[in-house]
A protein has these predicted regions:
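Cleavable N-terminal export/targeting peptides
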Residues: 1-26
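Transmembrane beta-barrel strands of outer-membrane/channel proteins
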Residues: 35-39, 79-83, 119, 171-175, ...
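Gram-negative outer-membrane beta-barrel proteins
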Residues: 39-47, 85-91, 123-127, 177-181, ...
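Residues that define the transmembrane beta-barrel architecture of outer-membrane proteins
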Residues: 51-61, 98-101, 151-155, 188-192, ...
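Repeated loop/turn-to-beta-strand initiation elements of outer-membrane beta-barrel proteins
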Residues: 75-77, 113-115, 166-169, 202-207, ...
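Detector for outer-membrane/organellar transmembrane beta-barrel domains
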Residues: 187, 193-320
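Outer-membrane beta-barrel "beta-signal"
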Residues: 354-367
């Protein structure tokens, strides 16, 4: 889902808000959010079909507070608190955290960059997710590019460099990524994230690398989970095209790959954790059409392992076609259809080779 995109807008002060308070000439606090709900029919082969309300068909629902203070001499303090929720039930997206999407404070200077401390998106996730064209629920870029999916790390320090002729670099380190809260540093899962971005008008190019140091690696782990991503997009005005490639090793660095074999870590299948590799490709196209756009996206993830029954793991493919219609700068109607092979909503790779289809429509409102 394109959560990081909207979070970045909010952090930059570009998102419309229902409340914006200026405490004095150099301080501001802003309330912002997204409410997205729709109706969808989902079918998984071998499991049947399900219809009902869909939370976040286009973008996950969230609300947040962000603020800045001018400290003088080019320095500024900033913060962001962001929480996801389900509008179909009114419940929090994460019952264990008040601000699951973000809770950080930082200092920034035009000459020295932006330093942020707290729970936040990694540099790799932020840069990689910007290449996504179609963010449909469970069938966006994150379905195959797990290092660009919607995940955050706790106890993290991120630094983003100043912009220089279109280039920006970022580096991040999480001292306790999944909140194990052990006293000794090496008893906690740590993460490092690096990224380089180039942006010049219609052109965007990114490269990222991330690695996890697990506090307690699973038995027969093939090494530290890591992910490398590279891609670019170009807006030709009549069409926008996005291309990306990713290589993931030894499990998912975002701890967001499910737990089909009971490893208890969200690293994905045991065969992947035990030295497996996944290569993924993505092609996305956006074509303006009236007050909206037609969105087409295809991605493929190719694993290199065999399942316990000796069968070779098959490629997972996700293809979507959708349309967004802007009723106003804040409100968007949308409709989409998606098909995924060898993929379920719970697991990126399915030993049973299940196929998933989804058709949905809804409304997304930003405030």
């Amino acid at each position: 889902m394109r959560i990081a995109f909207f979070a970045a807008l909010a952090a930059a002060g570009l998102m419309p808000s229902c409340v914006a308070v200026a405490a004095d000439g150099g301080t501001s606090v802003q309330l912002y959010g997204i409410v997205d709900a729709g109706v969808a029919v989902t079918r998984v082969s071998g499991q049947g079909s399900q219809s009902g309300l869909l939370n976040g068909g286009l973008t996950d629902s969230l609300w947040g507070l962000q603020g800045t203070e001018d400290l003088g001499s080019g320095w500024a303090a900033s913060f962001q608190l962001e929480s996801g929720f389900d509008p179909s039930s009114g419940t929090a997206a994460d019952s264990s955290r008040l601000f699951n999407y973000g809770a950080w404070v930082g200092l920034a200077h035009a000459s020295y960059g932006d330093l942020r401390l707290g729970r936040q998106y990694t540099v790799g996730q932020t840069y990689g997710n910007a290449l996504e064209i179609a963010s449909w629920k469970d069938m966006g870029m994150g379905a195959t590019f797990k290092a660009s999916d919607n995940y955050q790390f706790s106890n993290m320090v991120n630094w983003y460099s100043p912009q220089w002729q279109g280039f920006q670099a970022g580096v991040g380190y999480a001292f306790d990524a999944d909140g194990q809260n052990q006293f000794r540093t090496n008893q906690n899962t740590r993460a490092i994230s690096l990224g380089l971005k180039y942006e010049d008008g219609p052109l965007l190019a990114v490269a990222t690398w991330e690695q996890l140091r697990l506090a307690t690696p699973p038995a027969q782990a093939g090494g530290r989970p890591q992910a490398f991503q590279v891609g670019a997009s170009y807006d030709f005005e009549v069409v926008k095209v996005s291309l990306a490639w990713s290589r993931q090793r030894n499990g998912y660095v975002g701890l967001d790959g499910g737990d089909p074999d009971g490893l208890g870590l969200g690293l994905g299948p045991a065969a992947f954790v035990q030295g497996g590799t996944v290569d993924a490709w993505l092609v996305g196209v956006s074509v303006p059409a009236g007050p909206g756009a037609v969105l087409v996206q295809w991605s493929l993830a190719r694993p290199d392992w065999r399942w316990d029954n000796g069968m070779t793991a098959r490629n997972a493919q996700v293809a979507t076609l959708g349309y967004t219609y802007d009723l106003s700068p804040r409100t968007t109607l949308y409709a989409f259809a998606g098909y995924a092979s060898n993929y379920t909503l719970d697991n990126q790779f399915d030993p049973g080779n299940a196929h998933t289809t989804r058709i949905g429509t809804g409304v997304s409102h930003r405030f």
